Amino acid sequence: AASDVYKRQDKMQWFNEPEQWEIKDKSLSMQVTPQSDYWRISHYGFTVDDAPFYYATYGGEFEVKVKITGDYKQRFDQAGLMLRINHENYIKAGIEFVDGKYNLSAVVTHKTSDWSVITLDKAIPYVWIKAVRRLDAVEIFYSFDDKEYTLMRNAWLQDNIPVQVGFMAACPDGKGFNVTFEHFKVKHLPDQRRLEWLKKNAE
C-alpha cells in the first residue's frame, strides 16, 4: 500500500526551510522564499541551491506523486517534485511560470543543469506530477485529473543509491508566492533486477 507520509511528518525534513509553512488535512502549504532556486552553471553562468525542499529519503525503486496548486506570479515561479542525490545530482519537475504562460517543466542536473518545457495553452488550476524510479532512470509524468498520465521526461539517475524524495518550490525573480502540495504518496516498487533474478531462480 502507498504510504501517506503526512501522517508521519517527522519522517520528512526541510532543506532550506521557508519562513512560513503549515501542514493541515494532509496538505502542505508554504510561502515560497523570494529569490531562491535550484540551478547549476549552464547557460546562465551561476549556481544556486537555496529553494525550499521538503523530503524523505528512500533507497531502491519507487513511484511518487503529488498534486500541486500554485499562485504563480513572477517569471520562473515554479513548484514540483524533486528527487535529489546531492547538490550536483537532482531532478525537479512540475509547473514553471514563464512569460505569462504555464509550462510543464523539468530540470535534470548532473554537475550542470538542463531544462525542458512543454508550454500549456491556458492556465490550469492544479497539476499532478508522478515520477517512477526504476533501474538507472526516472520517468516523469503529468496529469490534470490523476487518471490519465502523460510522459514528459525520461532521465538518467544513478541507481543503487539513496535519494531524497519530496517537493520543492522556487521563486528566482519574485517576492514569493503561495503553493500547496496535496496527496503526496511514495509507493515502494520491488527491485527490477531482483525480480528478474527470481524468475530465473524460482523455487
Range-by-range predicted roles:
Residues 178-189:
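Exposed low-complexity, polar/acidic, P/S/T/G-rich flexible segments that act as propeptides
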Residues 7-60, 189-203:
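Low-complexity, Ser/Thr/Pro/Gly-rich disordered linker/stalk regions
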Residues 11-14, 148-152:
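Tryptophan-centered short beta-strand motifs
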Residues 155-177:
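Flexible glycan-contacting loops in extracellular carbohydrate-active proteins
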Residues 37-102:
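Secretory/extracellular carbohydrate-interaction modules
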Residues 80-132, 137-139, 185:
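Glycine-aromatic-enriched beta-strand/loop faces of beta-sandwich-type recognition domains
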Residues 1-6:
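Short, small-residue-biased leader/transition segments that mark boundaries at the very start
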Residues 140-145:
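Conserved Ser/Thr-centered positions that define the repeating blades of beta-propeller domains
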